[in-house]
Amino acid sequence: MGLRFARDHPWGRALAHVSAACLHLVFPTPCRLCGGALDPGRRSVVCGPCWAGLPRIGEGGCPCCGKPYGDPAVLAASPEHRCGDCRAAPPPFDIARACLHYRDEGGGRPLVLAMKYGGRPGLAEALGRRMADEASARLGEGTFDLVVPVPLSRRRLRERGFNQAALLAGPIAGRAGVALDVRSLRRTRATPPQTGSAAARAANVRGAFALGRPARIAGRRVLLVDDVFTTGATVREGARTLLAAGAARVTVYTLARAD
């Protein structure tokens, strides 16, 4: 009880920050990507130059799902031009945005795989802080009032030991000053890892989510957070479930996105 009080009390949190800074000076933590020194003022495991050098997603993509366009002339001719996927099957979410390209070149995909399968929850939290840094620029100010991570099945959570989406979502909610809800959206069944075509992925997650606390969602502008947007099947199904429970709108934010 005493330790918990000390950790939750403002003085306890301040002491923890000072202790962490002192430990960093004595035993500096290297960047998980390059091994270089980290800024002790930032609670991160990825240095600024490495983050800046990752394959970033810039402006110039589908205004709905954020899919990058190879030819910038597409948006120049029609700023509201939606990609073929969004025109063929309009998504239930308002917009989706991501920070990194999910590909081997540049390190985006290896970074995500290391976070998910390398037993590195600290890396997920650090990347969540980087996502929080960019949330306003990518999503707009005041666009959500509740953050919900895509849940794992109980079996997958036991195997991995953590839900990377929840660890990414925590810093985003904290920076925005809104609640993080990790209990309302839940998996109704374990699903195999997402592979194959868009249709196969959609079938794999159809009906895989449910709301445990619908009243918590009703009327809220929800930010749905996940690690990777590939075809969008998982976040589409999650968004449908949230909207069926009465969410006012759903915005999607992922660490990475497949081209």
Where are these regions (language model features)?
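Glycine-rich phosphate/pyrophosphate-handling loop used in enzymes and phosphotransfer proteins
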Residues: 1-226, 230-259
